[in-house]
């Protein structure tokens, strides 16, 4: 039986010390595509958390009844089910966000984090630890997206969650040609790549210092 301490480690390890995007370098494609605004970053983070947590739970629940010959396809079917539910929920209640995210919600099924947690952990442990690990892996992915989204939206549009943060009067105009201008690079996908690279670099520095101690 898994102890409470183990439950705690299943939840907190994927948030930082075993972060799937910063440590394992998984799920970076969507990180580049959906982080132009904070709203889309948060939505994708929540969606991946729910899909990974729920799919890991059911993969674990069915692990003793799933033959190895159909293991992968069974996992894909379970993941697809929750991706469809999330996609339809967003279309029904948050259509504007769903339209902005476009195909990327459906492409959660191809996110390596989701399949990775099902294959490497969920099929080896009981359902509760599997759910905690999967959900926390999604949250770990989500906070990285949030950091990138905050930087990109703030410097690319001057807003956060659609609200004006950088005052309009500081921007360049006909009477104030030397004023501030949004960084157009932040709207483009390469900016997310650079920001993610910096975050991974900082994590590697932290880990190397820990190893030297």
From Swiss-Prot:
Topology of the protein relative to the lipid bilayer: Multi-pass membrane protein
Q: Name one GO biological process term.
A: sodium ion transport
Gene Ontology CC terms, in alphabetical order: plasma membrane
Query: What InterPro entries does this protein's entry cite?
Result: NqrD (IPR011292), NqrDE/RnfAE (IPR003667)
- Write out the entry's keywords from A to Z: Cell inner membrane, Cell membrane, Ion transport, Membrane, NAD, Sodium, Sodium transport, Translocase, Transmembrane, Transmembrane helix, Transport, Ubiquinone
Q: Could you name the domain of life of the organism this protein comes from?
A: Bacteria
Q: Report TM segments.
A: 21-41, 42-62, 77-97, 101-121, 131-151, 153-173, 183-203
Chain's role: NQR complex catalyzes the reduction of ubiquinone-1 to ubiquinol by two successive reactions, coupled with the transport of Na(+) ions from the cytoplasm to the periplasm. NqrA to NqrE are probably involved in the second step, the conversion of ubisemiquinone to ubiquinol.
PANTHER family recorded: ELECTRON TRANSPORT COMPLEX PROTEIN RNFE (PTHR30586), NA(+)-TRANSLOCATING NADH-QUINONE REDUCTASE SUBUNIT D (PTHR30586:SF1)
HAMAP family to which the protein is assigned, alphabetical: NqrD (MF_00428)
Family according to the record = Belongs to the NqrDE/RnfAE family.
Q: What is this protein called?
A: Na(+)-translocating NADH-quinone reductase subunit D
Q: What is the lineage of its organism?
A: Bacteria, Pseudomonadati, Chlamydiota, Chlamydiia, Chlamydiales
Q: Which gene encodes it?
A: nqrD
């Amino acid at each position: 039986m898994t102890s409470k301490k183990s439950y705690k480690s299943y939840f907190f390890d994927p948030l930082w010390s075993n972060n799937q995007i910063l440590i394992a370098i998984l799920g970076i494609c969507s990180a580049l595509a959906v982080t132009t605004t904070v709203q889309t970053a948060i939505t994708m983070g929540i969606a991946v958390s729910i899909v990974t947590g729920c799919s890991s739970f059911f993969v674990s629940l069915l692990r003793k009844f799933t033959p190895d010959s159909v293991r992968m396809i069974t996992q894909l079917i379970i993941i697809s089910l929750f991706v469809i539910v999330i996609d339809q929920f967003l279309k029904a209640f948050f259509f504007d966000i769903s339209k902005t995210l476009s195909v990327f919600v459906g492409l959660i099924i191809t996110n390596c984090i989701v399949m990775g947690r099902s294959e490497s952990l969920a099929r080896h442990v009981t359902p509760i630890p599997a759910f905690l690990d999967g959900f926390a892996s999604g949250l770990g992915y989500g906070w990285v997206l949030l950091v990138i989204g905050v930087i990109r939206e703030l410097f690319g549009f001057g807003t956060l969650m659609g609200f004006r943060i950088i005052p309009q009067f500081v921007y360049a105009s006909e009477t104030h040609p030397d004023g501030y201008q949004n960084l157009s690079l932040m709207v483009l996908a390469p900016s997310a790549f650079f920001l993610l690279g910096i975050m991974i670099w900082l994590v590697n520095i932290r880990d190397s210092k820990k190893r030297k101690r």
